[in-house]
Regions:
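Long, low-complexity, charged/polar intrinsically disordered regions in eukaryotic proteins
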Residues: 1-25
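Long, charge-rich, low-complexity alpha-helical segments
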Residues: 26-96
Length: 96
């Protein structure tokens, strides 16, 4: 099983200078994400797993994969707790 984070479709967002700015229409709250959180946000399309996202982070920031995965999990948990991300679990097909 692996998590496949997905952006909450109820939110409006734009990327400005490489950083995501997210607006919650329910309460007009604005969330400004840093570069790393923005990478996770833009990758969270429901098709890329946490492992996929961690791999991109490891390559981009030149850190070991376990470090990138720990950071990705922490940020995904934080964004999910704020209602910005939704996460789906599914079985990963061999060779997929």
């Amino acid at each position: 099983m692996n998590l496949f984070p997905e952006r909450n479709p109820k939110l409006a967002w734009r990327e400005i200078d490489g950083e995501a700015v997210i607006i919650s229409p329910e309460d007009s709250h604005v969330h400004e994400l840093n570069e790393t959180a923005s990478l996770i946000w833009t990758s969270a399309d429901g098709r890329h797993s946490v492992d996929d996202i961690a791999g991109v982070m490891a390559a981009k920031y030149n850190v070991p994969l376990p470090v990138a995965k720990a950071d990705a999990c922490e940020l995904i948990e934080t964004l999910s707790a704020k209602g910005l991300l939704l996460s789906k679990q599914r079985e990963v097909q061999a060779g997929a």
